[in-house]
From Swiss-Prot:
Protein name, UniProt field: Acetyl-coenzyme A carboxylase carboxyl transferase subunit alpha
HAMAP family assigned: AcetylCoA_CT_alpha
E.C. designation(s): 2.1.3.15
Oligomeric and partner information: Acetyl-CoA carboxylase is a heterohexamer composed of biotin carboxyl carrier protein (AccB), biotin carboxylase (AccC) and two subunits each of ACCase subunit alpha (AccA) and ACCase subunit beta (AccD).
PROSITE patterns the record matches: COA_CT_CTER
Keyword Glycosyltransferase applies: no
Leading EC class: transferase
Family according to the record: Belongs to the AccA family.
Ranges where the CoA carboxyltransferase C-terminal domain occurs: 39-293
Organism field: Cupriavidus metallidurans (strain ATCC 43123 / DSM 2839 / NBRC 102507 / CH34)
Top-rank taxon: Bacteria
Amino acid sequence: MKTTFLDFEQPIAELEAKIEELRFVQDDSAVDISEEISRLAGKSQQLTKDIYANLTPWQVAQIARHPQRPYTLDYVREIFTDFHELHGDRAFADDLSIVGGLARFNGQACMVIGHQKGRDTKERALRNFGMSKPEGYRKAKRLMELADKFGLPIFTFVDTPGAFPGIDAEERGQSEAIGHNLYVMAGLKVPLIATIIGEGGSGGALAIAVGDVVQMLQFATYAVISPEGCASILWKTAEKAPEAAEALGLTAHRLKALGLIDKIVSEPLGGAHRDAKGMATMLKRSLAESLRQFQGMSVKELQARRHERLMAYGKFKETGAQE
C-alpha cells in the first residue's frame, strides 16, 4: 500500500516521490543510478528523523489518526494466536466498534478487547468510526467479567475519538455503561494491561483503560476532548485546534511526566503506519514485560496495588512560602 503523507510530511513525500521515479527509470536504463538512489534514501531518512524529533502536539494528533495506522485487529493478528471473537452484550446488540475475544499470548490464555475504526468508507460506517455505543461498552464489560471468572489476564487496545454522542446512545444509558465499566475494572481479580494505540478520546477511551498498567504508543494521544472540540468551545472555531492540542497536554511524554500513564512504547521511524510489523514486535515485547510483573502476585496484592495506583491520581502537595 502506498504511504499516505500528512501535510507536515510533504518534504519527505517529495523526496520519496523522487526516489520512486529514479527506481522506475533504473529498471529501463543502462546507467547505474543506485548510488543516487541510496543518497536520496539516506537524505529522506534523516529528514524524517529531524521532522519527527520536533513534532508539535497537533502534529502528533494527526499521526494518531493516520488512516494507515495499525488498529486493534492488526495487532491481534501479529501478537496473539488462536483468537476467537465473541459478540454481543447479551442485552441489546453487537456493537462492532469494539472487538474482543479469547486468545493466547505467548501460549497463555487471555482476553483481548479493543476499539476498531475501519479502513474504507463501508467499514468505517460499520464500525461507527470507532465511537462506541452503550452496547459496545457492555460487551466489553461482559468479556472482562468472563476473563475474571476464569482467571485470564486482559489486554485492551484504545483507539477512539470518544464515545458516540447520539441521542440513541444516550437513551440506552451511555454514561451508565461507561461508569459501570470503571467500577468493574477497579475490582477485577486479574491483571488488565491497557494500551492507547491511536486516539484516546475521553470517557470512550477510559471505559476500557482502567488498567494495572497503562501504556501509550509514542505518537498516540490521550485527552478529555479532541483538539477541535476544545477549540470550538474555548475559541468558537476549530481552526484553533493546534493551540488546543498544546493546552490539552495530550502527548505520551506529557502524560508520562504527569504520572497518568506508566510506559511509552517507541514507534518505528515515521510512525507505526510506516512499519506495522515492527511496531507489533515492539508492542508484544512491552506487553510481555508488563504481564511478567504480575506473576506470582496474589489477588489481594493485585487489588491493593490497583487501588493505590488509582487513588494517586490528582494528588498534589501545597508548598507555602517559608516564614
